[in-house]
A protein has these predicted regions:
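Ribosome large-subunit tunnel/peptidyl-transferase-proximal elements
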Residues: 1-46, 56-60, 69-77, 83-102
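A cytosolic small-molecule/anion-sensing beta-strand core signal
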Residues: 66
C-alpha cells in the first residue's frame, strides 16, 4: 500500500467525498485505512466486568484505500504517488509536485 500512517489524505468517493484527514491506521491485509474524524459509525457496547461503561460510542470506520488520495504537501490538492530509488533507498514522491514524502 502506498498510503501510510500519519499521511494527510483526501476522500475522493463516497459520503465523505472532499474531506481531508490524517491516517490513523492502515490495514494492509484488507487494503483499508482509518482516517481521523471521517466515516464515523456508532457502536453499541456492553459494560464489561473490568468497569468499562456501556453505551453508544462513535468511532472511525475503515475506508478502502482506492477511495482516498494523498494530499500534496505543496498545494493541498490530491496527488498520486510514485516510488523513486536513489542511492539504494526507495522514497515516495508526490507526482503532482515532485515533492519527496519520506
Amino acid at each position: 500500500m502506498k498510503i501510510r500512517r500519519d499521511d494527510q489524505v483526501i476522500v475522493i468517493s463516497g459520503k465523505e467525498r472532499g474531506k481531508k484527514g490524517k491516517v490513523l491506521r492502515t490495514i494492509p491485509a484488507r487494503e483499508r485505512v482509518i482516517v481521523e474524524g471521517l466515516n464515523m459509525v456508532k457502536r453499541h457496547t456492553k459494560p464489561t466486568p473490568q468497569g468499562d461503561q456501556g453505551g453508544v460510542i462513535e468511532r472511525e470506520a475503515a475506508i478502502h484505500v482506492s477511495n482516498v488520495m494523498l494530499v500534496d504537501p505543496k498545494d493541498g490538492r490530491a496527488t498520486r504517488i510514485a516510488s523513486v530509488t536513489e542511492d539504494g533507498k526507495r522514497y515516495r514522491v508526490a507526482k503532482r509536485s515532485g515533492t519527496r514524502l519520506d
